[in-house]
């Protein structure tokens, strides 16, 4: 049983007395009667009224199960309907308990992206069609959270998030980091307080009825001062049902947060008892061009503790604009391509999808890391399936397997298992596959487990693969083994030596470096060998980061004598 309520503001433009009746009729859900409250109002005045009632078993809204009801307001005069308006509403509960962020009592993980409103032809105006396609693409990539960076989104976007199931952090249109965060910050002068409070409260009033909005963000990178303290108090006076977030001053809000922590730092928050708040990463995995590294490592750390809520990748969509070339073709361009100076170069190309909503390679990495089903092999060679969902079982999925032999599919079939419940782990045997009984020596076998939708969803068709894992099977060990005479090992305080017929190898006892390799009495090295690795630079590095010695060590190999 759950107590539900509604607060309404009504203005009657008629001179004569009218009558207001507000029925709330849920669709396809148990409900004890129809809530109805007549109210007589006189013309040209504003009234506020509230409506309370009890549901026996309401279907709660979550990103996994976005159950919605329809609220209908009817204005009548002398028994005749003058006007009707309706709105979709959802019932869900957001609380913080014991430093854990809970939605409907469960410690959900927010698997998110930061989203700017951007279209390659219309700029910051985004069509309703693109908004819907973006949300559907998010759902297909297992993204369940959006941080509206760094301003409230188009009203239609919240409607879509209510409908499809996306947890939203709504963020006020405040950013002044050009002044940085010291005494010059606009967050300090009292004359700037009304501007801060007005923008934040306008966001709260406009979007407070959306179940998808599960937290308020006071702004982004705008200093820690008293103006945000005043605004936070105003938010709490208006809405106690959602926690607040502000990365630049964790002390005044409900959530703890920072930007771009290391994986180790993220992992350390799991056991940090001196930090008494849920931990949320407002920006991480900066995805400029070929970046977004360590995403799986981040999520190993995030999933190590209920106190770590999750986070939002920077960011969702490239903010490029089309430029028509002399040959008539269109090219997605960024800073400097329009002869604009100064500019920020490719800094607007941080997306998980291209400006035209084409998935980038990172999109598929996000989809796999964010997936809500994990499959692995147990030590005794069985298949372990973990349902990471908090509210739904695995009955909506067809589970299939494919056996590959050196990468080529040789067998496939269905994996019949009981549907794992929310947060449940089940273990099943590997299917009886003839090719596994007669494995070829030295051949690499892998079992791919796939989870596909049994039915159409609003964001994907039947048969769409939402999750998969590839399980590496042991290689058959029947290859001939090379036989060599036993060697000799000698240990000293400064070096360890392995020797055999006509050779010896020395390792530095302190560093582990390969110090010398001698063959037939002839030393081959002038200096000890050391790791000298080179990788392609990421687009995150050429700016300020590339000036740090730590970065140069990775990108600039040095020659060694050998």
Name what the model sees in each region.
Residues 32-49, 54, 408-439:
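Intrinsically disordered, low-complexity Pro/Gly/Ser/Thr-rich segments with frequent PxxP/GP/PP motifs
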Residues 6-7, 11-29, 386, 392-413, ...:
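Beta-strand-rich binding/interaction modules
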Residues 135-141, 145-350, 354, 361:
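Substrate-binding/catalytic cleft of secreted carbohydrate-active enzymes
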Residues 1-5, 10, 554-562:
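Single conserved hydrophobic/aromatic residue that forms the stacking wall/gate
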Residues 7, 11-95, 453, 457, ...:
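Extended acidic/polar, glycine-enriched regions
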Residues 328-377, 388-396, 437-477, 524-526:
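Catalytic cores of secreted or luminal carbohydrate-active enzymes
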Residues 74-137:
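N-terminal carbohydrate-binding accessory modules
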Residues 62, 430-442, 455-457, 470-556, ...:
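Beta-strand/loop-rich accessory regions of lumenal/periplasmic or secreted enzymes
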């Amino acid at each position: 049983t759950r107590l539900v309520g509604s607060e309404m503001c009504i203005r009657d433009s008629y001179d004569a007395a009218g009558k207001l009746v507000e029925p709330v009729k849920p669709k396809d859900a148990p409900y004890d009667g129809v809530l109805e409250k007549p109210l007589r109002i006189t013309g040209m005045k504003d009234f506020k009224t509230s409506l309370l009632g009890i549901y026996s078993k309401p279907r709660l809204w979550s990103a996994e199960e976005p159950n919605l009801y329809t609220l209908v307001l009817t204005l009548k005069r002398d028994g005749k309907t003058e006007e009707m308006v309706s709105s979709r509403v959802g019932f869900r509960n957001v609380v913080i308990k014991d430093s854990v962020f809970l939605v409907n009592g469960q410690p959900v993980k927010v698997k998110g992206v930061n989203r700017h409103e951007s279209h390659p032809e219309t700029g910051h105006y985004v069509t309703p069609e693109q908004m819907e396609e973006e949300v559907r693409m998010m759902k297909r990539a297992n993204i369940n959270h959006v941080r509206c960076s760094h301003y409230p989104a188009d009203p239609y976007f919240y409607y879509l998030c209510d409908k499809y199931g996306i947890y939203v952090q709504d963020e006020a249109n405040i950013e002044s980091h050009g002044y940085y965060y010291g005494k010059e910050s606009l967050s300090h002068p009292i004359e700037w307080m009304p501007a801060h409070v007005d923008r934040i409260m306008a966001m709260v009033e406009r979007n407070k009825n959306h179940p998808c909005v599960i937290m308020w963000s006071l702004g982004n990178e705008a200093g820690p001062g008293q103006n945000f303290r005043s605004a936070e108090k105003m938010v709490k006076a208006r809405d106690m049902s959602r926690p607040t977030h502000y990365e630049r001053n964790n002390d005044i809000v409900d959530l703890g947060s920072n930007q771009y922590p290391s994986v180790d730092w993220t992992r350390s928050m799991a056991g940090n008892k001196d930090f008494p708040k849920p931990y949320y990463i407002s920006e991480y995995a900066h995805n400029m061009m070929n970046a977004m590294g360590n995403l799986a490592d981040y999520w190993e750390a995030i999933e190590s503790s209920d106190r770590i809520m999750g986070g939002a990748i920077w960011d969702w969509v490239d903010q490029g604009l089309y430029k028509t070339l002399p040959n008539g073709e269109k090219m997605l361009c960024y800073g400097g391509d329009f002869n604009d100076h100064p500019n920020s170069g490719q800094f607007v190309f941080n997306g998980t999808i291209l400006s035209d909503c084409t998935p980038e390679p990172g999109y598929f990495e996000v989809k796999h890391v964010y997936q809500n089903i994990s499959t692995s092999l147990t030590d005794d060679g069985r298949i372990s399936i973990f349902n990471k969902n908090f509210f739904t079982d695995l009955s909506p999925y067809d589970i299939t397997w494919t056996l590959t032999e050196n990468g080529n599919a040789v067998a496939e079939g269905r994996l019949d298992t009981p549907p794992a419940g929310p947060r449940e782990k089940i273990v099943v045997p590997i299917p009886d596959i003839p090719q596994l009984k007669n494995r070829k020596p030295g051949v690499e076998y892998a079992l791919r487990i796939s989870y596909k939708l049994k039915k159409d969803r609003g964001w994907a068709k039947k048969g769409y693969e939402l999750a998969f894992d590839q399980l590496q099977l042991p290689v058959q060990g029947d290859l001939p083994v090379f036989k060599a005479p036993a060697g000799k090992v000698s240990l000293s305080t400064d070096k360890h030596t392995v020797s055999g017929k006509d050779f010896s190898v020395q390792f530095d006892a302190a560093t582990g470096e390969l110090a010398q390799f001698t063959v037939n009495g002839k030393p081959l090295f002038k200096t000890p060998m050391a790791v000298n690795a080179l990788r392609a630079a990421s687009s995150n590095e050429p700016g300020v980061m590339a000036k740090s010695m730590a970065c140069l060590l990775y990108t600039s190999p040095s020659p060694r004598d050998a």
